[in-house]
Structures are given as C-alpha cells and as structure tokens.
Amino acid sequence: MSRYRGARLRVTRRLGDLPGLTRKAAKRSYPPGQHGQARRKRSEYAIRLEEKQKLRFNYGVSERQLVRYVKKARAQGGSTGTNLLKLLENRLDNVCFRLGFGPTIPGSRQLVNHGHVTVNGRVVDIASYQCKAGDVIAIREKKPSKKLAETNLEFPGLANIPPHLELEKSKLTAKVVGKCEREWVALEINELLVVEYYSRKV
C-alpha cells in the first residue's frame, strides 16, 4: 500500500485530529460517506485497524514501511509500542516538523527530499533518516532554503518543541540532545492496539 495522497480532511473526519498530516480541522465530526452519521458498534479488529491507520496517515508512511518499523521495534526489546512511536518520531521529516521547519510532516518531507536540510553538515535527502542524540540538523545556507524555513517558523504546525530537541531559531539550526519520550508524542494514539493489530500479521 503506497503513501496516501488524497484529501486530508476526509481522513481526519474518519480518524480524528492528525497534527502531522494537516493543520486544518474537519468541519464535521462524523466520518465521510453516506453512512457517516450512523451509529454502530465496531468490532475489536475495526478499532485496532483505526489506530493503525492513525499512525500511518499521521507520519505519512506506507503499509510496508510501517511493517518494517514494527519488526524493528519488536527486535529492540522492551515496549514494542513505545519503541515504534520513537522510531517514527525520530524520522528526519518528523523532526523537521516538530522543530517548525515544515508546516506538516508531508511539508517537511518535501523540504528534506528537495535537499534543503543538512545533518551534521551534510545534505540528507532521505526523509526516513533516523535522527539520534548529538545530531545537528540545519537548513542549508541558501536563500530559497532559508526563506522556506523562516516562513514556516512564523506559523509552526505545533506550538511546543519537545525537550529532546533544541532549536536556534536565528541560525535555523537544531540539535538532538536526548531521547524522545512517550509523553512528548503529539498524536493521540493507543499504540498497544497497533501492536495487537500486527501481532498475527508480522
């Protein structure tokens, strides 16, 4: 399953607030479609599937990528759900979003893919790059790159930068100073349900 490129508000109407996907709030609180307002009891599978979809759409990863992250999270030991969230939070596109360099995760991914971002002094155009403690993330010293980031920083997607990231706004540089903790994840998600969803599939 490829990365979603359709109407974002349609997704948020179905899944709820996804801060990484879009800034806009859905005007209607019920799911889209002819039967969107109908009340019916959902199965446990449907609930787990919805939580998985929240994770996939918020971070903008394909089903195949998410499966790989689940396998990696499981191999790390400890809480698979927490490990999974940390892996997604440490993606370079998400880190750029949390810093305010991009308005959303898709916007930040575009910033990375187009070569506007450096890590430790080198251009990194791979959105899935795993940021780690000590990494210095910066916007390239080019006028178009700086203008893009400066514009986005005026209206960041999220109000607060998590404590494991330090931003020097005037220099358009930041540093990863620690590990991302579960409570700093902006998305409202029950990651245990995601792990349960994949328990028989992965």
Swiss-Prot record:
Molecular function in Gene Ontology: rRNA binding; structural constituent of ribosome
Entry's Gene Ontology cellular component terms: small ribosomal subunit
Annotated GO biological process: ribosomal small subunit biogenesis; translation
Region (Disordered): 18-42
Pfam families: Ribosomal_S4, S4
Record carries keyword Phosphoprotein: no
Metal-binding is among the record's keywords: no
Domain S4 RNA-binding: 90-152
Record's function text: One of the primary rRNA binding proteins, it binds directly to 16S rRNA where it nucleates assembly of the body of the 30S subunit. With S5 and S12 plays an important role in translational accuracy.
Subunit structure: Part of the 30S ribosomal subunit. Contacts protein S5. The interaction surface between S4 and S5 is involved in control of translational fidelity.
Similarity section: Belongs to the universal ribosomal protein uS4 family.
NCBIfam families cross-referenced by the UniProt entry: PRK05327.1, rpsD_bact
Name of this protein: Small ribosomal subunit protein uS4
Native source species: Synechococcus sp. (strain RCC307)
